[in-house]
Amino acid sequence: KRKRPHQPAPFTRVRAQRITDKEGFQTVSTGYLDYMLDELEIFLIPDKKLVTDAGYTEFRTNALAEYQDTIHAHGLVMVPVKQTKEDGITLIQGGDLLIHYTSENDKQEKIDKMRACILAIYKDATKDFFR
C-alpha cells in the first residue's frame, strides 16, 4: 500500500492535492470529506496510456457505490474496469475514480465536473448531520 498525505479539510469545500507517483500517475486527493466518503481519489490518465488491472490493485477503494445515481445525474460516465472508455470517467470496484482525458481543457472540464459531483454527493451524505 502506498502512503498518501492525509489532511482533514474544512467541511464546506473540497481541497485537491496533486501527487505524481513514479509511474507518472497523477492523483488528485480531495481530502477528508467525512467518514462516509472516506478519501476519494481521482486518478488522471493521459489519453492512450495503458493501465493494466494490476495497476489498479494498489489504489484503495471506498464505498461510493451507493452514490452511483447521483454521479450519473451529474453527467459523469462510469464504466466497469474491463470496458474503460478513453474519454470517460471510470468507477473502479465501487470506489476510486479514473478520469481519462485527451487535452488540458478536457482534463480541466472533467475535474470541474467531478468536483461539482463530489460536493453534491457530500451535501447529500451529510444532510442529516448538519441541519
Roles of regions detected by a PLM:
Residues 113-131:
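Hydrophobic, aromatic-enriched interface-forming segments
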Residues 1-114:
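Nuclease-adjacent, charged terminal/linker segments that flank catalytic cores
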